[in-house]
């Protein structure tokens, strides 16, 4: 029953009610338009691209030859498109497409250590870069696996606060390219992670898991190019520590990438032997931006055994790095970073054929970088 008082109120606020009805109708129309044009109700599309313009200047022995082969200015790109699908709200099916044309210094041509994290070359073809599925088991366990999964996709914690999307490739391996080799292939892993920040993970993958010939590929075969990793980490909100162990086979391709070590260390890791790698990492991030940077550091050691290299039976290599990043430098969203370290170098070696060990222990140099990232818009940065 509409009382006189209610009629009076309706008449008094008639204009406001009409405005509200119009706004509701407008919102319903917009929601309908979004539902009609949205990509998917279960899938998110994420994309990123790097455009790189630059050149390198060479110094030292062999610089004239390097300049003649890779001394020009280049302009190239890296493109990534990721489709993330969830069927239950807790699981995730990741399909990532990638394309690039960095057949230049940024892809590791000439001096491998100058290779960048984004330095991929697919000759402009679009390839399936990732294809894996993860789902929870209970409240604390997660299983991850797929035909194109990378080692770090199966880790609950990445042991570094230093950015990995704009830097030299070496500085994206937490100082231990042997333990965190970022091997890619067919595999699976499981991890346990508590709300308090403690986690344990283990995984196995085959770099040639798509092949059925056990001599050149397969899973669990001599030709599998396998990589098995176990990590223990404790990572509360603003800091963390981690220890990792990886056993890998250099057979058919699993080993250090050229941007992660000296020529000798990379060659030995790719020989038909076994590697046992260890990594220790720690990182800390300040609660507020300011003069104090985030600090990340890591150290790695790799034992190489049963090598089929012509003059080497076994060897030991080491590596380390320290990375600092300041947030909101000059303007909110901008950042400045600097990193220094030693890419993987040989520290001990067992040679044969009358060779001199000292000839193989040379060349353990240093790598360093600094960057300033300017946030032009929410989605565009210039570094």
Regions found by a protein language model. Give the residues of each.
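Extracellular loop and loop/strand-boundary signature of outer-membrane beta-barrel proteins
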Residues: 61-69, 116-119, 173-176, 214-218, ...
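Outer-membrane beta-barrel and related beta-rich outer-membrane complex signature
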Residues: 59, 105-109, 155-159, 163, ...
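Outer membrane beta-barrel transmembrane domains
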Residues: 245-272, 281-283, 294-383
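Outer membrane beta-barrel
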Residues: 42, 48, 54, 68-209, ...
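Residues that define the transmembrane beta-barrel architecture of outer-membrane proteins
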Residues: 73-77, 125-129, 182-186, 224-228, ...
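N-terminal periplasmic/intermembrane-space "pro-region" immediately following the signal or transit peptide
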Residues: 1-66
